[in-house]
Structures are given as structure tokens and as C-alpha cells.
Amino acid sequence: HYCLDIRDKEMYPELPPMQIVINNAGVQNEDDIDINLKGTIAVTEHYAVQPEIRSVIMIGSASGHTGSEFPEYAASKGGVLSYTKNVAMRIAPYQATCNSLDFGGVMTELNKPVMEDEKLWNAIMDLTPLKRWMSVEEAAEWIYFMAVQNRFCTGQNILIDGLEAGNSNFIWPE
């Protein structure tokens, strides 16, 4: 894997043709559109739209389906959902798949401040039917299955949120 600022195309390393591309870059700040959407498009166009590709996985968000949480974040992830279908159509001639895995809450470092705020965490759990968030390992299992084992499902935005979207009133407090 590579860590870099995906907004800077000059930083992209030259690599042999890839078979799997997983777009996992993401932020929740003033750079949401530039990183979450434009950066995802740039990486995908640079590395994934080519004959050797077998699978492209976009890491979307439940917010892309519901519009919940922060406006720029929800809009950036909504754009990823539409772009997933565009890529799926373009790589289908290579017998490749492209899907978006749209997680709800995941126990990551990015979400650590939320998990450590007892009042906020309890309020979120009150709205979460399973009363927990997904582990990183559970997310990795979904990614592996869709990237490696799946050969037919394509162009799909798969909502994996433990039914959080069932509570459409979920908005982060200001």
C-alpha cells in the first residue's frame, strides 16, 4: 500500500498495472471534496481504468446514502457512489468489478474522539440498532470478499451500517 496526498498527482508512484485498487483515503474537514471525491477519481483514473484491473473498491459512507452528518462530507461520499457506477461501466469490458462499500460507524483512529466522548458515544449508541460500531477487522473482511472473491456483483453501493440509516435523523451536533 502507499500513503500520499492523493490531491497531488505528481506524487503518484509509477507502478506496474494493478489488479485491485482500494480507494480508502478519506477525511472529515474542509478538504472533503478535494480528497474524498476528486482524489478518489484521480487515483482511480490513474491506476484502475486499464485492462489488467480485476476489482476496484470505493470506501464510501452511509452518509452518502442518507445525507446525514456534515454537509461537505455527505456530498463528497454521495459523489463517490455515483462515480462507482461510472467506473463499473467502464471496466466491465475487462471482466472487472467496481463496488462501493458504504460503512456506518467503524472503530478507527479517525473516530477515536467520538468514541472517547462518553456523552456523544451514548447518544450515538441510542440511535444505533446493534448498539455497536463495526470493527476494522469486519470492514477488512468485506473489502477482501468484494475485491478478491466477488466476480459478478458490480456497480453497487453496498450499505453496511448495522441499520444506522434506519434512523434518518442522525446528525452530528455542531
Label the predicted regions.
Residues N24-Q28, L163:
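Conserved NAD(P)H cofactor-binding loop of Rossmann-fold oxidoreductase domains
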Residues S55-G79, T84-P93, G105-V106:
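Catalytic loop of short-chain dehydrogenase/reductase
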Residues D102-P113:
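Short, flexible catalytic-loop segment of classical short-chain dehydrogenase/reductase
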Residues E118-E137:
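Catalytic Tyr-x(3-8)-Lys segment
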Residues A92, T97, C153-Q156:
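Short, small/polar-rich loop/turn modules that mediate ligand/substrate recognition or access, typified
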Residues R132-I160:
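C-terminal substrate-recognition "lid" of short-chain dehydrogenase/reductases
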